[in-house]
Amino acid sequence: MMRHLHDCVAPAKLNLFLHVTGRRDDGYHLLQSVFQLIDLHDVLHFDLRDDGEIVRSTEVAGVPAEADLIVRAARLLKETAAARGIEVPGASIAIEKRLPMGGGIGGGSSDAATTLIALNHLWGTGLTRPELMQLGVRLGADVPFFLLGRNAFVEGIGERLTPMATPATWFVVIHPGVSVPTPTIFTAPELTRDTKAVTIADFSKRLPGFGKNDLQAVAARAFPPVADALEWLSDVGDARMTGSGACVFAAFASETEADAALMTVPSHWRAWKTRTLDAHPMATLLQT
């Protein structure tokens, strides 16, 4: 058995659009979106432990280890293996946290997915991609997307994923220095909850500026730095927010144009140039 698996990438995502089409009786919102993998990422390192413990060996500001999706994902996989009669060792997990928390780019969910992928391989537990996705939904609505490992048209509460091809694109992503709690946005009375449903064909015919983010107006009103970043980025591109915020982004026709925009971003914001990915960098470790 291998003893370690290092430099495991957990990529971010952008919501190219995000429509709220309704709300279920249980309070969950019905969504439509295209989730786009991008090459911004966290990096995780896994080492086996002989004592059977799951340990996060690096500190993450504001996130106790017991509440971290990384630890929860590892323990869930260990429990699932035990239920199948498979005894596995423990693991020490170190993370290089590069993605902002509360940014709407899926950092925590992606970290959890990479943990499931890496430990399923390292432990030899043998779960297939669909089985890992079933575990993932117990950790968070976005986790199954990162386990799917491809860009997708997303519907329902996030559980209906249709893989799709998206064009190669350069983006500038800005984090305006605030963390936006998702429940704050979804519980706002003024949130639009009745956007007309669309199809993959609708999206494909009207790239790149299809649709909107129904959460954007609520987040911009509640968190002025989000509004400021959107206003600034709108001067150089088609700015929109990803997820429930706080990150905003714009697409550019070339890397040169993205570089030019990035150079002018005010220094008090974190900003990145990034490009699309066609597949999750860890996808080769997934069993179909």
Identify the function of each model-found stretch.
Residues M1-G102, H121, T125-P130, H175-P176:
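ATP-binding N-lobe of GHMP and related small-molecule kinases
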Residues L16, L44-F46, I70, G108, ...:
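Residue-level signal for inorganic ion chemistry
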Residues Q36-L37, V137-R138, P144-L147, P163-P167, ...:
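Solvent-exposed alpha-helices and their adjacent loops that cap or buttress functional pockets
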Residues D50-V63, T115, V137, F203-N213:
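Short, basic/glycine-rich phosphate-binding loops at helix/coil junctions
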Residues A73-R84, E131, L135-R138, A229-V236, ...:
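Generic non-transmembrane alpha-helical segments
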Residues A94-W123, A141, D238-F252:
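Glycine/serine-rich anion-binding loops at beta->alpha junctions
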Residues A112, L116-F153:
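Contiguous, small/hydrophobic- and glycine-enriched helical/loop subdomains that border
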Residues L148, F153-D238, A253-T288:
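Conserved, helical-rich catalytic subdomain that frames metal- and/or nucleotide-binding sites
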